UniProtKB/Swiss-Prot annotation:
It holds the Pfam family His_biosynth. It comes from Burkholderia lata (strain ATCC 17760 / DSM 23089 / LMG 22485 / NCIMB 9086 / R18194 / 383). Pathway: Amino-acid biosynthesis; L-histidine biosynthesis; L-histidine from 5-phospho-alpha-D-ribose 1-diphosphate: step 4/9. It is found in: Cytoplasm. Its EC number is 5.3.1.16. GO terms for cellular component: cytoplasm. This is 1-(5-phosphoribosyl)-5-[(5-phosphoribosylamino)methylideneamino] imidazole-4-carboxamide isomerase. The lineage of its organism: Bacteria, Pseudomonadati, Pseudomonadota, Betaproteobacteria, Burkholderiales. The active site is at D8, D131. The keyword Transmembrane helix does not apply.
Length: 251
């Protein structure tokens, strides 16, 4: 089970939002590269970056901070990024800079042809971010709820060749209310590609519950507010996940 720390970038700083509201941003660090180093030193095996300004602007807005993070840890672990990815040129720029994966969200829903082109051009590097509330997909920084069913879209995107899906329950994100395990497993069972859970992770019990369903296709979980607020000890949580999955050498 991959525990993936999230570094949400707004105006070059590391912040956390409540339910995607840019006006409810808590600044946790003014040095995102140092924050990336901290999580890697604590045992992170992948990082999840979000360009929040980019998500709302539709183009990269935190390049300097992203490049600083990649300079710091990009040679050590895979780094994925979402937010504002609307063109093949942007994807190419990010992958050339050292990102392992880019996450396409709104554009995948609104312009499936773009997603198909991206999967063809950058096979193995494209993750789709599906944000949902009550099973319906949301777009545009969660501000618009569509009529699309999550599972229908996920199956279509799997056919396009996406590498995995980051599934966010937007009713829970940033609220420390617990992961929506049921909805995440339902999605994972409906597709043959890995699903990464997101939204609401609050404590060690969530990690233990996720480890129980890893074999259903839930590859990892994005760790946000809980690891910044101190509700979840990241290093201890990754160790516990490894113990549960038999990934620690007992010798």
């Amino acid at each position: 089970m991959l525990l993936i720390p999230a570094i949400d970038l707004k105006d070059g700083q590391c912040v956390r939002l409540k339910q995607g509201d840019m006006d409810q941003a808590t600044i946790f660090s003014e040095d995102p590269a140092a924050m990336a180093r901290k999580w890697v030193d604590l045992g992170a095996r992948r990082l999840h970056l979000v360009d929040l300004n980019g998500a709302f602007a539709g183009k990269p807005k935190n390049l300097e901070a992203i490049e600083a993070i990649l300079d710091e840890v990009g040679d050590e672990i895979p780094v994925q990024l979402g937010g504002g990815i609307r063109s093949l040129e942007t994807i190419e720029k990010y992958l050339d800079a050292g990102l392992s994966y880019v996450i396409i969200g709104t554009a995948a829903v609104k312009d499936p042809g773009f997603l198909q082109d991206a999967c063809t051009a950058f096979a193995g590097s494209i993750i789709v971010g599906l944000d949902a509330k009550d099973g319906k997909v949301a777009t545009d920084g969660w501000s618009k709820l569509t009529g699309h069913e999550v599972i229908d879209l996920a199956q279509k995107f799997e056919d396009y060749g996406v590498e995995s899906i980051v599934y966010t329950d937007i009713g829970r994100d940033g609220m420390l209310q617990g992961i929506n395990i049921e909805a995440t497993v339902k999605l994972a069972q409906a597709v043959g590609i890995p699903v990464i859970a997101s939204g609401g992770l609050s404590n060690l019990v969530d990690i233990e519950n996720l480890c129980e369903v890893e074999e259903q296709g839930v590859e990892g979980v994005i760790c946000g507010r809980a690891i910044y607020s101190g509700d979840l000890d990241f290093a201890a949580a990754q160790k516990r996940a490894d113990e549960l999955n038999g990934e620690l050498d007992n010798a």
